[in-house]
Amino acid sequence: VGFKAGVKDYKLTYYTPDYETKATDILAAFRVTPQPGVPPEEAGAAVAAESSTGTWTTVWTDGLTSLDRYKGRCYHIEPVAGEENQYIAYVAYPLDLFEEGSVTNMFTSIVGNVFGFKALRALRLEDLRIPPAYSKTFQGPPHGIQVERDKLNKYGRPLLGCTIKPKLGLSAKNYGRAVYECLRGGLDFTKDDENVNSQPFMRWRDRFLFCAEAIYKAQAETGEIKGHYLNATAGTWEEMIKRAVFARELGVPIVMHDYLTGGFTANTSLAHYCRDNGLLLHIHRAMHAVIDRQKNHGIHFRVLAKALRMSGGDHIHAGTVVGKLEGERDITLGFVDLLREDYIEQDRTRGIYFSQDWVSLPGVLPVASGGIHVWHMPALTEIFGDDSVLQFGGGTLGHPWGNAPGAVANRVALEACVQARNEGRDLAREGNEIIREASKWSPELAAACEVWKEIKFEFPAMDTL
């Protein structure tokens, strides 16, 4: 008879409320804001269609394949409480729609085209359920939390870091000097800022050499293993690998990548190189707020965090809850658990739409960084626990006596908080008291307490449910 040409409603094909999801399906939760007059079922079905097999009209080649096998299905829709004309649309995608081991392909399919769709006023991807059948096709983090602790020989406490400031303008020699002072004072890591790549005032090779010198000198003096996140991000993938190879030849423990500006393809390749060559990989999330800050449009950071765990990274920045950068406590802890734990139970109060089973994929250390100082230490220790990296840039380098005393202040504050917690004290209630007690026998900490006693960044978090 031929096929029936013409345009038909998406919901006739792609809205299937009686569908039972399979254990191998990738499940997505979208926050959909339809245009006026578009029913939510049609909007949800349109999302399922445009992010899987559908197009705007019936095509004769539909008859050459099994749509039932390959189409995305919108299987449930619920209104968002307290919001007008917003719905959560749940979509199930058959696994065969995706290339194995490619975050790039997964995102191109699920969010590649549909966000510009005219029938929608706005669209946000809130969460993804990655089935083990798919996550098992990824290497994941180069090493993971336990292997990193074993490499560094550091247990039972969060790790301490510091971003070297001013982020741009220092010569390589002075930069290395700042690194040495911080590491000598008691930090575990120092860090290249995300936009430190290879600029005219400091070429990458010079920076790598002076930082390596600083690391070895500080290790010799303190007897502890030290590291500096050498930013390998570059304009081409070949150049990035060249920098990672040089870092490996210097014998340093860790390199760094800006995974959103660098891209998932480059990130996954770098993660593979890092595992094969014993390098840890620190991930910075520069550009994330462009994608995740709007409440009704874009992609929530928990999805970007899951994608990073699949693509590969040993550390990733994840907000502070208490500093100058974004993060509501329950929601932040939700995606922190998604980064660290093997199995995470569905919990809508924390923004977790699906239970996620990572099976044996290594975990990622969350990094708390941005506007934090010694007075925040009890809260950070309590909120993030041992498996985290606490990074104080200005909170180290802004110390009135210099970098090394700034590092000493942070290390003393951290050790005091960990000891108090281990003795059963309540960090949330007694935090200030614990810091004050410790500062009595640490002049460096006392000076830091004095400088930052009044600093607060008091704005409400945007990232609410």
UniProtKB/Swiss-Prot annotation:
Keywords: Calvin cycle, Carbon dioxide fixation, Chloroplast, Lyase, Magnesium, Metal-binding, Methylation, Monooxygenase, Oxidoreductase, Photorespiration, Photosynthesis, Plastid. One of its GO terms (biological process) is photorespiration. The record marks 324 as: Transition state stabilizer. The keyword Transferase does not apply. PROSITE patterns: RUBISCO_LARGE (PS00157). Gene3D superfamilies: Ribulose bisphosphate carboxylase, large subunit, C-terminal domain, RuBisCO large subunit, N-terminal domain. The modification N6,N6,N6-trimethyllysine is found at residue 4. Binds 1 Mg(2+) ion per subunit. This is Ribulose bisphosphate carboxylase large chain. It comes from Sarracenia flava. The gene is rbcL.
